[in-house]
């Protein structure tokens, strides 16, 4: 079965869009934490309660979001086939940095699940589950590459990447809840995380299969 280039490129276009959303969210959160008077938007900001929650745990927030942005940016570069082929040595060193960064992101996410509970038990359940899934995927990816099992390594890294993108996916979902204003952040935050993480994790597995199909078709056409 052949796979057209648009079919392969479309999912990755969506991925890049989500990475941009994530980096924009990290930038905004950083500015609000460092200069709240200038960037928070005051009491008229519908996200004022969320901003206050993050401000109470500013150090933990920075430990999570800054490595998180680095993880998504580096992982996106690492998945580029042309980059791996031209800079294999750099790819391997960046991979080590990526694993360390991912461990920080996953561990801090577990801590935040209980210390910064905005959406109640529903949010805690979602973030705890997917933080554990993220760490498992990351560790398995590392173990597979140590055994020189590149295909399995890539498969598990895509899964970890899918979980990481879940945070970006929650942003437009949260924005829609704010727009309708029928639920409070405590009521909808957990729902948003379940939707975001489940969507990107499932999509990540699908992208992995699509990637393998595309690679096999490319080999057959040579």
List each model region and its residues.
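Alpha-helical membrane insertion/targeting regions
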Residues: 1-222
């Amino acid at each position: 079965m052949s796979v057209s280039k648009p079919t392969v490129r479309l999912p990755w276009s969506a991925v890049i869009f989500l990475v941009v959303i994530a980096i924009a969210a990290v930038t905004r959160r950083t500015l609000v934490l460092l200069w709240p008077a200038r960037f928070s938007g005051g009491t008229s900001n519908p996200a004022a309660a969320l901003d206050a929650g993050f401000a109470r745990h500013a150090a933990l927030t920075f430990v999570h979001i800054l490595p998180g942005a680095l993880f998504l940016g580096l992982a996106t570069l690492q998945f580029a086939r042309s980059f791996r082929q031209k800079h294999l040595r750099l790819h391997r060193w960046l991979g080590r940095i990526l694993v360390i960064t991912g461990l920080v992101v996953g561990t801090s996410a577990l801590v935040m699940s209980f210390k910064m509970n905005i959406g109640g038990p529903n949010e805690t359940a979602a973030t705890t589950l997917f933080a554990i899934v993220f760490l498992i995927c990351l560790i398995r990816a590392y173990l597979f590459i140590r055994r020189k099992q590149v295909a399995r390594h890539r498969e598990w890294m895509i899964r970890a990447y899918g979980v990481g993108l879940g945070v970006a996916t929650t942003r437009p979902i949260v924005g829609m809840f704010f727009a309708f204003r029928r639920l409070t952040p405590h009521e909808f935050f957990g729902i948003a995380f379940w939707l975001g993480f489940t969507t990107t994790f499932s999509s990540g597995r699908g992208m992995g299969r699509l990637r393998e199909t595309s690679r096999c078709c490319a080999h057959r056409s040579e």
